[in-house]
Amino acid sequence: MKRTFIMVLDSFGIGASADAKKFGDEGADTLGHIAEACARGEANVGRSGPLTLPNLSRLGLGKAAEESTGTFPVGLDKNADIIGAYGYASELSSGKDTPSGHWEIAGVPVLFDWGYFSDVENSFPQELLDKLVKRANLPGYLGNCHSSGTVILDQLGEEHMKTGKPIFYTSADSVFQIACHEETFGLDRLYELCEIAREELTDGGYNIGRVIARPFIGDKPGHFQRTGNRHDLAVEPPAPTMLKKLVDEKGGEVVSIGKIADIYAQVGITQKVKATGLDALFDATIEEMKKAGDNTIVFTNFVDFDSSYGHRRDVAGYAAALELFDRRLPELMALVKEDDILILTADHGCDPTWPGTDHTREHIPVLVYGPKVKPGSLGHRETFADIGQTVAAYFGLSPMDYGKNML
């Protein structure tokens, strides 16, 4: 029975890639800088002391990071008994965003340039805004700028509730984000507005990767909170991913947990499981792993590392989340049967010690575990697509156009 379990620790980079300078990210190192901050006693909120990741260390995380940067992450166990195959991968895709990273993991790198709204103020074209106001019958809009999602809620959340004007904002990523209050504006209405925005962006040739619905609750600044009802409207990958090939060629199952289905625009996904928060994502993953049959991929995105800690530049929160993940990891590993493969990886970096609030261009860890996986170094992988090619070969699918089989 062949099953693969892919766990994406969203934004968990392990050192700047060779082309990081182009992105303003030379020297970024999500894992390394978190570990250093912990060792200096600068991440003692909700946790304390050096970064402790014994289970990830046994899978080779520390060694992969050392291969990536030349430095072993401080606090991790150098003498851990390695039980998995480990390496680090560079990104071939042109961007450092979520869809690019995930599509490349599935064997389809993004070799074109996304469209971006690069103006920090008055970010969106007036023609686009006018169409959204007219088609969605809006009283106007707020924002129209670059912002962090939590910051803009405190700035504009109250005005939004009073006026009914949605909050439009973007970032360095190829995104159009819309924040609305779940109760005063309504969740279904927000989703409808996002559908309209997706249509207008596509029809207008803007080449924007995602429209993201950002529902929130609360009644005043400091109390506004984003809910788990986020919804991403992505464009479809430009070629068949290994997910789609598994479904098409083997009649296989691909179970999406968290935001995976949205990232792939639902293509190549046979089942969606919604879960919010690290523990809930873990619980859902465990349930689906227990049920998974032959020719199945269970694919989970642990978004909190990125959304709650990376973008918010919360070092202690990121460290605590990693330690929680590590504590629960044996529960997943215990469900890996004789022919199964468990892959732990990331989609980009988001160094919480780095200036700004955006992603960082980094290598990702590639940790592979299973009874038939030979422990040891996989070295430097030249593209995330090596993961997709490896999974395609494992299931006996037609080869992907990019990537090499690692096993």
UniProtKB/Swiss-Prot annotation:
Localization per record: Cytoplasm
SUPFAM superfamilies reported for this sequence: Alkaline phosphatase-like, DeoB insert domain-like
GO biological-process terms attached to the record: 2-deoxyribose 1-phosphate catabolic process; 5-phosphoribose 1-diphosphate biosynthetic process; metabolic compound salvage; nucleotide metabolic process
Assigned keywords, A-Z: Cytoplasm, Isomerase, Manganese, Metal-binding
GO molecular function: magnesium ion binding; manganese ion binding; phosphopentomutase activity
EC number(s) reported in the record: 5.4.2.7
Pathway(s): Carbohydrate degradation; 2-deoxy-D-ribose 1-phosphate degradation; D-glyceraldehyde 3-phosphate and acetaldehyde from 2-deoxy-alpha-D-ribose 1-phosphate: step 1/2
Binding-site list for Mn(2+) 2: 306, 311, 359
Reactions it catalyzes: 2-deoxy-alpha-D-ribose 1-phosphate = 2-deoxy-D-ribose 5-phosphate; alpha-D-ribose 1-phosphate = D-ribose 5-phosphate
One cellular-component annotation, GO: cytosol
Free-text cofactor note: Binds 2 manganese ions.
The keyword Cytoplasm appears for this protein: yes
Domain of life where this protein originates: Bacteria
Sites where the protein binds Mn(2+) 1: 10, 347-348
Main localization of the protein described in the UniProt heading: cytoplasm
InterPro entries found in the cross-reference section: Alkaline_phosphatase_core_sf, DeoB, Metalloenzyme, Phosphopentomutase_DeoB_cap_sf
Transmembrane feature ranges: none
Cofactor(s) this protein requires: Mn(2+)
Described function: Isomerase that catalyzes the conversion of deoxy-ribose 1-phosphate (dRib-1-P) and ribose 1-phosphate (Rib-1-P) to deoxy-ribose 5-phosphate (dRib-5-P) and ribose 5-phosphate (Rib-5-P), respectively.
Family, as annotated: Belongs to the phosphopentomutase family.
PANTHER family assigned: PHOSPHOPENTOMUTASE (PTHR21110:SF0)
Protein name: Phosphopentomutase
Species this chain originates from: Yersinia pseudotuberculosis serotype O:1b (strain IP 31758)
Lineage: Bacteria, Pseudomonadati, Pseudomonadota, Gammaproteobacteria, Enterobacterales
Gene name for this UniProt entry: deoB
